């Protein structure tokens, strides 16, 4: 089974992304015609999820470059074209600072462009086409990587949890949105849930609402319902009671990641750290699922990760459709105040879960666990790194 949801629609020169701010009530696609469009779609959270952010950023610039090529507006000079692309990449990298996938993609793309430019016979158009091909390959590779993550993670949970060994079907708790809407397709943590469901090994999935942006309630619940996966939505503050009630009947808490430090400390959606503490207390496995591009070997620990802070209004207001539409039956979206005027607000978008609270980190290459001294060795994941062809 493959998820029917398609959040990114791309063909060369054309990019559409689903507007996640309107989900689950309205399904509408936004055309992305330039790097500037891509930057705004990421910054304003029309698209979110670390893998999807990187892909949309690259494809937005690919669309822009395709237009310049077709209009014959590309400089004939390879170096000029490389500089133009790199300036656009640096601009796109400022849209969301915490998610490492974007900065990692920018770094790798710059390396590819530099190597390509060294070819004396290379033209500006060839540099542009090389970039476009690289961006397109990212889209293809991400889907394949997600399916591998789903399989590796599901198999590890089945083999390493009491309910996995003893029962034929498992219950999983997840946080935020890590599915088709957060990636090129299938998902990371939600990909594990999908794989268990495909193999008839999933009893039930639980998803948190994920305040303040409600990605769990709006997006993960939307995906679970769409794929007919048995699931229940809970508020963030109910997770402790769920674990107290069900104990190790919850096989694992599975989350994604926006940045993983070299020691395994993981930055993810706010509330992840709380779930990890709860998992430790209740003896439930805590699993991080992310592609290798999310692992930042240049960041030593979680203390070095910059945490993005979002607008106060995301906490003090909530947006949704009226229960009844207008006189013609059309959906009417409204922004509602839910907090006292004048109250101070702190709104970090992410928190950092220490590696000590994480049982396993799942990537497309397999499952990483800690050694006898309680340390992850994530560097081994990059010993045979394969980049998308250009």
Swiss-Prot record:
Keywords of this entry: Amino-acid biosynthesis, Cytoplasm, Isomerase, Methionine biosynthesis, Nucleus
A cellular component term, taken from the record's GO annotations: nucleus
UniProt source species: Coccidioides posadasii (strain C735)
SUPFAM superfamilies xref list: NagB/RpiA/CoA transferase-like (SSF100950)
Family label: Belongs to the eIF-2B alpha/beta/delta subunits family. MtnA subfamily.
Keyword Nucleus set for record: yes
Task performed by this protein: Catalyzes the interconversion of methylthioribose-1-phosphate (MTR-1-P) into methylthioribulose-1-phosphate (MTRu-1-P).
Top enzyme class: isomerase
The protein's name in its UniProt record: Methylthioribose-1-phosphate isomerase
Biological processes, Gene Ontology terms: L-methionine salvage from methylthioadenosine
Subcellular location: Cytoplasm; Nucleus
Pathway: Amino-acid biosynthesis; L-methionine biosynthesis via salvage pathway; L-methionine from S-methyl-5-thio-alpha-D-ribose 1-phosphate: step 1/6
Chief localization: cytoplasm
Catalytic activities: 5-(methylsulfanyl)-alpha-D-ribose 1-phosphate = 5-(methylsulfanyl)-D-ribulose 1-phosphate
């Amino acid at each position: 089974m493959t998820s029917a949801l398609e959040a990114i629609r791309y063909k060369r020169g054309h990019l559409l992304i689903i507007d996640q701010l309107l989900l689950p009530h309205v399904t509408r696609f936004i055309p992305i015609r330039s790097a500037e469009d891509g930057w705004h779609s990421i910054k304003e959270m029309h698209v979110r999820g670390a893998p999807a952010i990187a892909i949309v950023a690259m494809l937005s610039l690919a669309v822009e470059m395709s237009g310049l090529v077709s209009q014959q507006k590309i400089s004939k000079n390879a170096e000029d074209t490389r500089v133009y692309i790199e300036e656009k990449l640096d601009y796109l990298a400022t849209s969301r600072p915490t998610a490492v996938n974007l900065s990692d993609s920018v770094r790798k793309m710059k390396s590819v462009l530099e190597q390509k430019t060294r070819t004396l016979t290379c033209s500006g158009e060839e540099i542009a086409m090389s970039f476009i091909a690289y961006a397109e390959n990212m889209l293809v590779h991400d889907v394949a990587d997600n399916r591998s993550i789903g399989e590796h993670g599901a198999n590890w949970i089945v083999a390493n949890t009491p309910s996995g060994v003893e029962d034929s079907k498992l219950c999983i708790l997840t946080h935020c949105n890590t599915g088709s809407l957060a990636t090129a397709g299938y998902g990371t943590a939600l990909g594990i849930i999908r794989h268990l469901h495909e193999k008839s090994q999933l009893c039930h999935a639980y998803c948190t609402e994920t305040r303040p942006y409600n990605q769990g309630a709006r997006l993960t619940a939307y995906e679970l319902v769409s794929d007919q996966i048995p699931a229940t939505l809970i508020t963030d503050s109910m997770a402790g009671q769920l674990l107290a009630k069900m104990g190790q009947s919850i096989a694992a808490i599975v989350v994604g990641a926006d940045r993983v430090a070299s020691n395994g400390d993981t930055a993810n959606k706010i509330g992840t750290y709380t779930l990890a503490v709860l998992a430790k207390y209740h003896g439930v496995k805590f699993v991080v699922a992310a592609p290798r591009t999310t692992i930042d070997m240049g960041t030593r620990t979680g203390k070095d990760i910059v945490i993005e802070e979002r607008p106060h209004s995301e906490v003090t207001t909530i947006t949704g459709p009226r229960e009844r539409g207008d006189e013609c039956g059309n959906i009417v979206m409204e922004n509602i105040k839910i907090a006292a005027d004048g109250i101070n607000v702190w709104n970090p978008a992410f928190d950092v879960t220490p590696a000590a609270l994480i049982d396993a980190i799942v990537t497309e290459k397999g499952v990483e666990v800690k050694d006898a001294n309680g340390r992850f060795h994530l560097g081994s994941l990059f010993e045979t790194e394969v980049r998308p062809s250009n």
